[in-house]
């Protein structure tokens, strides 16, 4: 073979290597240039303003478990807890250990999720181009990269958000057996299914297309693939099996009990369509850019489902079409309806038999059938789900609709090209329509990100959390508190928490330089010991009781209000407690000293509260995932039927610090003249079992025995006057 360069013919070994390399790179770029554009758009959408990512309870739990596993040498055996109170498998924790090993900052976990979702876009392009052509691959990958709902799940830490690349790889493995008829596909398919199940239990629905693949390609099955898959699945599930054995399979029993209840969830079809169209009800926030552009983008909600329907119909037509010749009619004329029905059934059975006979001989049709089964059967099973539907259940179906749209566009363009110039308008119109859809989706995603980064949303619209928090706002507030303490040489930062922030703030506060005390501010407030001087107090956005207690019982100077996206800001104070008005020698031995012999009355939000003042008589330093708890119960006028309890939780305690405990009084009742107070103490520690040399890690916690505290007079209660 001889190569021609610049008009000369020379042997290959004399061709300049640099010229060959340049030509090769030029050809490679010419054949794949679109993927660079797709990845550029995908990376912009997934990493622009990525620090505004959601950081609520689940996000903090997942990254904390990964971080603690790395830095404390623990073996994760569960992940976070599901909404039905079962423990998820720990596979995702092992993945998040990679960014956690590099930094304790959860931002790198968010970047890690974004990278995984970019890989999913790349795999979508490679898969679709391999089996359905370059145009189909380009359209499918571009639509998937710019779809709003999949993008949303690619911008925050959560175990289902790592599923997309593994879903595409799973379908890839099935196609290796069904379409290419290669052996050895079953092993990676089973392994990938196990990995997906570790990310979310709904992945078990992908077992249906796996069974269909086995039926369509029986000659490719090897027994050793099953053996290899069994061994590796046993290895990756062994940590979770340790947990299940120790709990006597309580999680599986919970799932079994739920199987008897359920209904048909037709709204699941709407969920599926929204994943495709990326357009739904505009946000209620009047400053939302998405809301402003909604009239210009609303057509996406019609066009995208129609394109997807075109993909389904096209794939279904190709799958069902088979060469057909009518059987010769029997001699004589059919008499009666019975004979006509029999003839129709005979013809139908003949069609089905010929279709099934010819199907295995056409791998292309087998692949399309597999795509349809992947999209239709799990969707129908989800509609019959026993415990309700949520958005992330549909991630196992992505990017299937976009692949089918790419197939539809490719076949439509090829058909119009093959039928002469009179159909050129259809081809060019298709190009224009797809280009407009992609541009509109890019605009829709970009303005949605701008809305999130600008706070043009309500932080209350994120059930099941009381309110939503983002990583940037939380880190900024903690950094401001830390910086203030260092600038003023204050030796402690007190931080209020509630159900929405306690997990996230407890983890993030560990990166602060100044010692911290975090406490649940639902009914309690911790103030510094007046003898040690003032301290910094960071108050949450909805801690109205804390602000009311500060006004009445402390000297608080508001320094700053660190902004929060989508809701009211934090409040940053420098505080010192006021002097007690009625000194008391009562208290609970070696635990709490009563500072004021009177319980003071407080009105807040049309409700009445009684407030008692105490000081800690001992200290406890922060410990690994440990909290210290006092449960105080009051009996107004000694009446146990009107009892009220307040639970105070702290990450640390310092001797001499002041504790304010508030008790809400019955609505419409009168203020009591006296209250009797009883107190119990317990510690919450992580439930990390030990199996010989293995120190396991779970998300669960254990409470030590509740100890009833003894008062200084030997009784188990203290009675104080209320005013």
Regions found by a protein language model. Name each.
Residues 77, 425-519, 585-588:
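Membrane-proximal, lumen/periplasm-facing interface regions of secretory-pathway glyco-
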Residues 40, 107, 111-131, 169, ...:
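Transmembrane-helix motifs of polytopic, lipid-linked glycan transferases
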Residues 153-154, 205, 333, 356, ...:
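Hydrophobic/aromatic-rich transmembrane helices and adjacent perimembrane loops
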